[in-house]
A protein has these predicted regions:
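Pore- and pathway-forming membrane helices of multi-pass small-molecule/ion transporters and channels
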Residues: 9-18, 33-74, 84-89, 106-173, ...
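Juxtamembrane or sensor-core-proximal signal-transducing alpha helices
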Residues: 170-182, 495-506
Length: 683
């Protein structure tokens, strides 16, 4: 701790960021690391034994192909085979018509690249077209580097082997021999979330960050998609399991902010918490065995009063609704998503995106051809790899690619100087490479925001030390050339994406916030009563809110990187947006508390008041796009009937009013926190 105190604050924040990113714990990560690590060592062994070139490309196939579960790995393997056919076909098309004409090669490769980049952004299978784009723009440089067409054709045919045998290898390892099934990961994830929920129910613990809660909720939704595709039993009882996922997400996210010490520890409340924890444990055991949980618990009047006193009635009701649900309930038919985005042919940003990528590649090609420096051909690959839809995400990818390349180059330099002279055989080489590949696999399986560092580090290391050599190598020029190529490609891409049709998310962010608040207003319009349809709708929209808040948070981080914006305007936009996100989360949890109280009343007394909140929130959201939103001021009229039956409801809704009043005023020249008390609200 004393060492951290002596470091500058930015360094401490950077270390904390990497600690959070790299220490991510999720089901399936350890098997994925092992599969990736073993696969890399097998690729080195096979490539060195049979003298197969392009080792770095084979390693890249593994890092992109081995996924967190067997079904996803199999799906990506199929995409890789399709992409390989399209890649080789496009290369032979270029060679056939323009082998000896560099200008004609570019004229043919350019439209192929543009079409692939356009489809990468607009089509569901964008990964296939991304791979084709990389090979098309890179493969057309082979004739310029080699004077013999036969050699070029041989290298192109080797590319088929280099791409397909790692695909076969990852299918054997990740799908057939040591599969990590999505259904097993789902059972583990649900049990982990319920463990956390029980801990917060019984002990006074600090709440976990909301971003972590939202990411865990999104992870459960992704696993649900894989389970539907991979497991027949899950599909048969999908309605129950989807309801289970929604219920567990709600319990986990709600109890995260629960503090048992905030309520009087009467004997009735203590016994009720123990009973609730016991029911959650029963759900855990059923999930661990892959069984649909059925409960015979019927809440008594005393238990209902205890649940209401400690704000647990809604959690109790959602849990019981799951326990009494028929496992054979037919699922709701899911709408099939379109293969292309709706505005694929009407939004000019997609074609501009393709043109910008092509322009960056042409500038890099002209530069390295003009200076006759073929070793920096990685600059063209960099232009394609860092091409993201907007300026902020492109900058993020540039930083990750540069950071991974820097780490890989340093490792390659140390390896060449200190280790390579002492190696005599393939066994020693594998022992030395094992920790490097393990480190790369560990980083590559971390959070999506930083995982690319691991992939780039291993690929850069392999390019500098293992590419097309089948024995000791002491040439440091390769290390220099690969690093310089990545730097040049990053600089060119940064200039192009910043000044040529920059796609800023500064205007999109308020619209995204408006959509999120619109979802929150829909939650407020759902009748606050224990009716099965209302509860299920409430839970599903609530999961959507987790995804929406997380998307807004990530968009804020990307907008912070858009240096082409005015610094003061950017800072003001980010501060206001983060305040809206923070208050929106608080409003959602405060509205949960009103459900616990409103359920005791006749619902006919409540719609007007709930509609008042929803209308105010929708009005505020409508003004975000034009920066005309003011902090809502809501007047609550005390209803004698509700005050007589349950006086705590009015206090809870007054708290919601206070949270509304703290929403930022977007018409002010600078963000000033709302200190005035909402009309009708009490402290």
């Amino acid at each position: 701790m004393s060492a951290l105190n002596s470091l500058p604050l930015p360094v401490v924040r950077l270390l904390a960021f990497f600690h959070e990113e790299l220490s991510e714990r999720r089901p399936g990560r350890v098997p994925q690391i092992v599969q990736l690590w073993v696969g890399c060592l097998l690729v080195i062994l096979i490539s060195m034994t049979f003298e197969i070139p392009f080792v770095a490309l084979s390693l890249a196939v593994l890092f992109y192909g081995i996924q967190s579960n067997a079904f996803y790995t199999k799906f990506v393997a199929i995409l890789f085979v399709v992409a390989r056919v399209l890649e080789i076909g496009s290369l032979f098309l270029i060679y056939k018509w323009s082998y000896g004409e560099p200008l004609i090669r570019l004229i043919i490769a350019g439209p192929i690249l543009m079409g692939c980049m356009f489809l990468m952004r607009t089509h569901r299978l964008g990964l296939v077209f991304f791979a084709v784009a990389i090979v098309a723009i890179y493969g057309q440089t082979f004739p310029a580097m080699l004077d013999y067409p036969e050699v070029v054709v041989r290298l192109t045919l080797w590319c088929i082997v280099v791409g397909l045998y790692p695909t076969l290898l990852m299918t054997l390892i990740g799908v057939l021999w040591f599969p990590s099934r999505a259904i097993t990961q789902m059972h583990q994830a649900l049990n982990d979330r319920l463990d956390d929920a029980i801990s917060h129910l019984t002990d006074s613990l600090a709440p976990l960050p909301e971003t972590r809660i939202e990411r865990e909720a999104l992870a459960l939704q992704k696993l649900n998609v894989f389970c539907l595709a991979d497991d027949a039993n899950w599909r048969t009882q999908s309605a129950w399991w989807q309801s289970c996922v929604a219920t567990v997400t709600y319990i986990y996210s709600t109890l995260n902010r629960y503090d048992p010490t905030s309520f009087a520890d009467s004997q009735a409340i203590i016994e009720f918490r123990q009973k609730l924890a016991s029911e959650i444990n029963k759900l855990q055991h059923a999930v661990a065995e892959g069984q649909c949980w059925q409960s015979d618990w019927r809440i008594t009047e005393s238990e209902a009063m205890a649940a209401r006193e400690c704000n647990l009635e809604n959690i109790c009701q959602t849990l019981l609704q799951l326990g009494q649900m028929d496992p054979n309930t037919p699922p709701t038919p899911a709408a099939k998503p379109p293969s292309m985005v709706a505005d694929a042919f009407t939004n000019p940003d997609y074609m501009r995106y393709a043109v910008k990528t092509l322009l960056a590649c042409l500038i890099c090609y002209t530069f390295y051809s003009g200076v006759d420096w073929e070793g920096i051909h990685t600059c063209m690959l960099t232009c394609v790899i860092v091409a993201n839809p907007n300026v902020g995400s492109s900058y993020q990818k540039m930083v990750l690619r540069f950071g991974g390349a820097f780490c890989g180059a340093i490792l390659a330099l140390l390896f060449t100087l200190l280790v390579m002279p002492w190696l005599d055989n393939i066994v020693e080489l594998l022992f030395v490479l094992a920790p490097i590949f393990l480190l790369g696999a560990w980083i590559a399986t971390s959070s999506e925001r930083s995982s690319y560092i691991g992939t780039q580090m291993v690929v850069t290391f392999a390019l500098a030390t293992l590419e097309n050599v089948f024995g000791p190598v002491y040439d440091l020029v390769e290390i220099r050339d690969r690093a310089m190529g990545i730097i040049i490609g990053t600089v060119v891409s940064a200039v192009i994406y910043t000044f040529v049709w920059p796609e800023s998310e500064a205007r999109t962010l308020p619209q995204k916030l408006a959509g999120t608040l619109g979802m929150l207003s829909k939650v407020m319009r759902i009748p606050r009563q224990q009716e099965v349809t209302a509860l299920r709708t409430y839970l599903q929209i609530r999961i959507g809110l987790h995804a929406a808040f997380n998307a807004c948070e990530e968009m804020c981080q990307r907008v912070a990187l858009e240096r082409q914006l005015d610094s003061e305007e950017r800072a003001l936009l980010i501060e206001r947006s983060q305040t809206v996100i923070r208050q929106g989360r608080d409003i959602l949890h405060a509205w949960d508390a009103t459900w616990n109280s409103a359920q005791a009343l006749d619902n006919a007394l409540q719609p007007d008041r709930a509609a008042q909140f929803a209308d105010a929130l929708e009005k505020y959201a409508a003004g975000l796009a034009t920066a005309l939103s003011r902090s809502p001021q809501i007047t609550l009229e005390e209803t004698p009937a509700s005050q007589a039956i349950l006086p705590t409801l009015l206090k809870q809704e007054q708290h919601v009013c206070q949270l509304f009043a703290r929403l930022p005023d977007w018409t002010a020249p600078a963000l000033t926190p709302a200190t005035e008390q909402a009309q009708g609200a009490t402290q």
